[in-house]
Amino acid sequence: MPRLRVPALIVVRTTWILVSIVLMVAAGVAWATYQDLNEGVRRSRAIAPDAPRSTGAVNILVMGLTTRLDLNGEPLPDAVLSQLQAGESDRGGYNANTLMLLHIPNDGSQASALSIPRDNFVELHGVPGEPIKGKIKEAYGRAKIAEESRLRSQGARSPRELEYLGREAGRRAQIETVRAFLDVPIDHMAEVSLAGFYYLAGALGGVEVCVNNATQDTYSGSNLVAGKQTLNASQALAFVRQRHGLKNGDLDRTRRQQAFIASVMHKIRAQGSSALPGLVDVAKQNVVVDEGIELFDFALRMSNLTGGRMAFQTLPIEHTETVDGESINIVDTHKVRRVVAEIVDPPARKQQKPPAPVPAAPAEAQPPPPPTADSIPCVD
């Protein structure tokens, strides 16, 4: 009986699918769960196909928005808003209050999460009159407003379409601004809403944190005792939002955000695959990723992170100033780029002349040592 000849391409595809299933089972990820996430999560075209790319390693820009609206621009339910303790739905704007660059090497070595202080005074790109100076967090909102104004002048658009196109302009501007500031490629992006932090903590049944001192803050609603404690969803959001009453203000808040992520990863690791369905539901409603990201490949890369192989670092600032009544961070762009280059491209850096020493930040601007993702760190 003649042997059936299967086209090589089909063999390759079939083999890849089988290998994928085996790997995902080994990683504790159900194929149905992956399919649900891959088909349900929102996608963005903010990163152009011809944009600069990393070689081998991957850089992912994570943006956390302040908006109190959902992905369609609709107000969140009143019950959720009251739990957020973040004011009415028209507050918050579209600032990217959380900016973090995830660098995942392709050799299995330690990954890094670089927090970019939101008030860094830098050149904004992708906004009217660019490049103009402003807080790095503002690129998203400025571009969104300008694009919606331009579209309205061209004719009627539905509110949902305006929201989508405005946000796409905001994402492009924020990515371009961070790319220019750090001088590294941005391969992928992930955007998380304010409510996303709340729903994430809820899906995990609370998040354990540790604070060095008891804190109470009426602005964020944070009310914590000293030491380790498990926070519900509302308390967890207050924990990552608080900056008033903290010695280093925004820098301490940045460290809290890092500690929150480390704790979330610690709990996901502990819960295993049982946590996945709830997390997928949260992602589908509160997360936007770029079209080019392959979630299966990303999940495999991220398996290193949930194993504790991730270090957090906050990029340096020089000092703070007050301009027009607002506090801004003055930064040395060349110094920041040297710090980033040492993490993102160490082999290339070693072949060049040694970089100049990076002066320490002022004492009042220096946070404690950064957390790692294999424990629950104590923070201020």
Language-model segments: residues:
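Non-catalytic, solvent-exposed segments at the cell envelope interface
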Residues: 2-380
